[in-house]
């Protein structure tokens, strides 16, 4: 084997609207494609639409789809390590499952990214397509030579809940795109198009039980002096004057909407990383979030942490975040902290995981 590592990356998260896993996969692919020690290809585990992968990958990256449906593949892989990925995509040194599931392989070393294990405690949150996800993730972790996690908090849960040996787990923190550090509040045209008020609190993320928006809504309703709440992401119902929804936003609009917020709030019941909190810190926006191990780790003392489910405490924290502008020293500290998370570092640690898997 040459020093250049042949990597087959699961690019399925790049298709459709990108939330957390899609943004991770996109940034990782961009960095890997620029590294001389990596020869990257991508595969999409979908029977339809996989050709769109070519349009969203870094220039010149080869890709292919699978001649069978993802649902059928998952059913097969749940029962046995067949069909192997080489049957469809040819030989490679490493196959990287970027989205919880690792395809079986005959010869390739397996690297698996587990973003969180929230579904183990709340299986009812899973959709019909993901009903077998807990078993698939457990099988994938057992099959993998290395498991990557975004935080040490998730690594600890993987070791405890999946009984994965600690020396098999590598923490590969996510990164903050440099564009966040120069983001500016939305223009009048963008405010008008999205229906943004002059002052607003912001939640960024897809709708779902894990995000605990019911807790946020209760705290917001119980504190009438707070500005309107804006929900940015897919799946949110239309609101009213006090709660507004933008739907899914492209990156350039999202950066402006975050930069213009009075504060960003992430009230999640569980998080593996919480990328929006770092992105908010990068553009000088105060952060209020649940007091969870991963969020404590990621925010590093630069956010207001609230006990999960405490309505009064959340309302008070949001009020406090708006009370007075941060000092220049506080702003500088937030930005310095956010700047320590780079996608290049994510890729370098991931390549280290590939080399460990091949050792």
Set out the residue ranges of the language-model regions.
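Carbohydrate transferase catalytic cores enriched for Leloir-type hexosyltransferases
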Residues: 1-359
